[in-house]
Amino acid sequence: MSTNKINKKSIARIAAVQALYQNILQNNYDMYDIMQNILACYHSNNSIDLPKNFKISLSISHFKMLVKSVFENINKLDEIIDNHLTNAKDSVHMPILLRALLRVSICELLFCSTTPAKVVINEYTDIANDLLNEHEIGFVNSILDKIAQENNKIS
């Protein structure tokens, strides 16, 4: 029997998006408590419906680094997101999950990644593909690509 695994950093990225989403939903509830709850969930696999031979574990250090970096740069991240919207009111009406995903992905792309930009873009586009609608997936891919180009992360 083989054991299937998903990259630990990929799981950390998903968990970071979950933490930011939960933080927004709970009106900036204590991020430390949210992080602990998410880590406990992933540690126990209690709320994850997977085949028994499928193992999920996350890179705790990558998860904590992403969440901490988002909060250290949250105003700058929101400014970057808002600057890439075509309409100012889009910011107010942006779905919470989309905003959480953009905050984490842009943060990793610009402020805390030794991972190549193309890998970051692909990872978050894959996450978006699992969580968002078709229009939002294209938007995530487009905005990350533009930001990477603007910051000379890719040519």
Curated annotation (Swiss-Prot):
GO terms for biological process: DNA-templated transcription termination; transcription antitermination. It comes from the Bacteria. GO terms for molecular function: RNA binding. Keywords: RNA-binding, Transcription, Transcription antitermination, Transcription regulation. The keyword GTP-binding does not apply. InterPro entries: NusB-like_sf, NusB_fam, NusB_RsmB_TIM44. Belongs to the NusB family. Involved in transcription antitermination. Required for transcription of ribosomal RNA (rRNA) genes. Binds specifically to the boxA antiterminator sequence of the ribosomal RNA (rrn) operons. PANTHER family: ANTITERMINATION NUSB DOMAIN-CONTAINING PROTEIN, N UTILIZATION SUBSTANCE PROTEIN B-RELATED. This is Transcription antitermination protein NusB. It comes from Rickettsia prowazekii (strain Madrid E). The gene is nusB.
